[in-house]
């Protein structure tokens, strides 16, 4: 009878100690799952933020490209290139240049050229 009690007590103590170990293991597993879930949610939040920033950047680049496309200078004649004082037929001089008659006489006296102002 004593051996039965001792055996029962031994089995009871082992069951309680192993049960607590499993409970501690479950707690650790839960902590790991929570940390993993938090890491995943922060990863998804970062991806969402990245997508929003990329969309915003794309919109900004579109606006700047439209502005530069509309404001760019059309074809023009560079310095020292023959031009027409009334730029209907020929290209106008580029910005910062004026279509002037050369000061020296020579074979080109009938033409105007683009010079700096």
From Swiss-Prot:
Its main location: secreted. Disulfide bonds join 76-94, 83-99, 93-114. Residues 1-21 form the signal peptide. The presence of a 'disulfide through disulfide knot' structurally defines this protein as a knottin. Belongs to the neurotoxin 14 (magi-1) family. 01 (HNTX-16) subfamily. Probable ion channel inhibitor. This is U9-theraphotoxin-Hhn1a.
